[in-house]
Amino acid sequence: MAAGDGDVKLGTLGSGSESSNDGGSESPGDAGAAAEGGGWAAAALALLTGGGEMLLNVALVALVLLGAYRLWVRWGRRGLGAGAGAGEESPATSLPRMKKRDFSLEQLRQYDGSRNPRILLAVNGKVFDVTKGSKFYGPAGPYGIFAGRDASRGLATFCLDKDALRDEYDDLSDLNAVQMESVREWEMQFKEKYDYVGRLLKPGEEPSEYTDEEDTKDHNKQD
């Protein structure tokens, strides 16, 4: 037998059992391999379990964020329409109620809270006196961009940029059904919170003449 062959056989025996007489006994090498295999299996199981928990956590966070967004869309709009908060100080207390009249776009712009302490805005062709909400609709307010303007498009698209304002009369004809429904909802909310003082006139449209009786009747309805 060559020496090289003996070396190979010794190496083989060294990696097996110390004695082959027991037949069924497990060698240290086999035990180590089994332990190593079990370790990998445990690690893989832990990884899969951890990954499942991570996916579950991500899903829960996504659901919470979706719920918060829906609440913001639903109640945030109401908060915007409910501008006058309890205990809010505003110049409205010193201003008499405005007599009912109709406005052109140019006339409406005079009531932006800077040139005139009274603040008006239009929604869906209706003009509302929002002076008591000056904290919100005044020049320094978060929604001051709507003061003295037709706010319909901005409210329908929830856009507070100048892009939502039109210098000419806006017939809103390009808004879709959902956006127009939003405009009507805003109109109802402003009717509940603020004084309706007249209509926003279309180009060439003549203003209506309102009697004191009609004016008083409208104010009583709002009260």
UniProtKB/Swiss-Prot annotation:
One of its GO terms (cellular component) is endomembrane system. The modification Phosphotyrosine is found at Y210. SUPFAM superfamilies: Cytochrome b5-like heme/steroid binding domain (SSF55856). Coiled coil: none annotated. It is found in: Membrane; Nucleus envelope; Endoplasmic reticulum; Secreted. The modification Phosphoserine is found at S90, S104, S208. Residues 102-201 form the Cytochrome b5 heme-binding domain. The modification Phosphothreonine is found at T211. Expressed by endometrial glands and stroma (at protein level). Detected in urine (at protein level). Residues 206-215 have a biased composition (Acidic residues). Residues 15-33 have a biased composition (Low complexity). GO terms for biological process: adipose tissue development. Required for the maintenance of uterine histoarchitecture and normal female reproductive lifespan. May serve as a universal non-classical progesterone receptor in the uterus. Intracellular heme chaperone required for delivery of labile, or signaling heme, to the nucleus. Plays a role in adipocyte function and systemic glucose homeostasis. In brown fat, which has a high demand for heme, delivery of labile heme in the nucleus regulates the activity of heme-responsive transcriptional repressors such as NR1D1 and BACH1. Non-classical progesterone receptors involved in extranuclear signaling are classified in 2 groups: the class II progestin and adipoQ receptor (PAQR) family (also called mPRs) (PAQR5, PAQR6, PAQR7, PAQR8 and PAQR9) and the b5-like heme/steroid-binding protein family (also called MAPRs) (PGRMC1, PGRMC2, NENF and CYB5D2). The cytochrome b5 heme-binding domain lacks the conserved iron-binding His residues at positions 137 and 161. This is Membrane-associated progesterone receptor component 2. The gene is PGRMC2.
